[in-house]
Amino acid sequence: KMHSGTAAGSDGREFVPRLGAPIVSLAVASGYENTEQEYVARLADGSAVFVASLSLKPTRVFSTIKCDAMRAIAPENTHANVSPQPLAADLAAGHLVLLSGHPSTVQFVDMATQSHVHDMEIAPSNRVSRPDEAILTPITVCNVVFSAPLRDAMHAEWMATIDGREGGSFTTELSLKLWQWDSRSKTYVLNTRIDHPHNKGVTCVRFSPCLSEDPLNAFLLATTGGDGQVKTWRIASRSLKGARTEHFWLCRSSFSYRESLPHHVAWAPDGSLLAVAQGLFVTLWDPQTLVMQARLATPELKDVHTCDFCGRKGRYLAAMGSPSRLVIWDLVSQSVVWSVSD
């Protein structure tokens, strides 16, 4: 027999762990043309897993776009507290990335065919708890962003993710992970893990546009956090044995402005300016020298929470904030040229 999610202790029971999601139903697929019998498990994320009856190993998976299987087992009082879900696009590959059947896993979806491409586990974790134990608090992927593709590349070179969990073993868990595209394995491989990149959570993550053909200087990464800091991260290298070189990411700079909380960050199209939405202001910084170039504010915005460059060559900057208002500045004249509210 195949048992999943049943307490151990009875003779004759065999287990197939980590199928990916809670089991909804089971069926038996009879063998044909001298093939062995298989078990078919329909999972709560919408996928179907075939398990060989002799080896009890999964042989293949059929899946469309997966749904969040944790909703089916989460307590009712948690359904209303749904946080924003990460959503990103690798435009070079034509892939949309969103949460998969488990909060610690993302799925890649082909935007042209609207079909499931593959899953990628960002943080290894147990999917299902024992019946006599409390439901596990999963590590959740909070943010996913991609760098711009290098010249003639079919995929973004870098992917950054933020994952975490409230009240982990001893304290809140939070990790910034940098993944690099590996053309041999056709997937992203973990390059750098940075625990607690900010002391009080991460509010935004953004890659710069491509700044150089040199891989070491091609990109910067900007993050903002609940600790009031704006940080930039860069690629570094070190020599290994055998004349090999390893690339990794480290913190390049950290700065703040008037103890205001930064909510969002945006890069100018040419990478020459870094805009930060924080409190009453949108501040503009030179990312190389960290000298503030301008401070934009208007009485119409009480708290700016989002900003981005727009227009030809990023001449204009759009900002949204409370009370539900969109404002656009001309950066040449540093004046408001358009404003609209809900």
Provide a role label for each language-model segment.
Residues K1, Y39-L43, V97-G101, A160-T161, ...:
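Conserved beta-strand element within WD40/beta-propeller blades
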Residues K1-G5, A48-S53, V106-M111, F170-W181, ...:
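WD40-repeat beta-propellers
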Residues M2-A7, S53-T59, T113-V117, Q180-K186, ...:
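Short loop/turn segments immediately following beta-strands, especially the blade-tip
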Residues G9-F15, T59-V61, V117-D119, T187-T192, ...:
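A structural motif specific to WD40 beta-propellers
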Residues V16-G20, S63-T64, N77-A80, A134-L136, ...:
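Surface loop/turn motifs at the tips and blade-to-blade linkers of beta-strand repeat domains
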Residues G20-G31, M70-A89, P138-S147, N199-C210, ...:
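Canonical WD40 repeat/beta-propeller blade segments in eukaryotic WD-repeat proteins
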Residues E36-Q37, A93-H95, H155-E157, S212, ...:
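Short coil/turn segments that connect the beta-strands within blades of beta-propeller domains
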Residues T64-E76, M120-A134, T192-N199, F248-S254:
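Surface-exposed loop and turn segments in beta-propeller and other repeat-based domains
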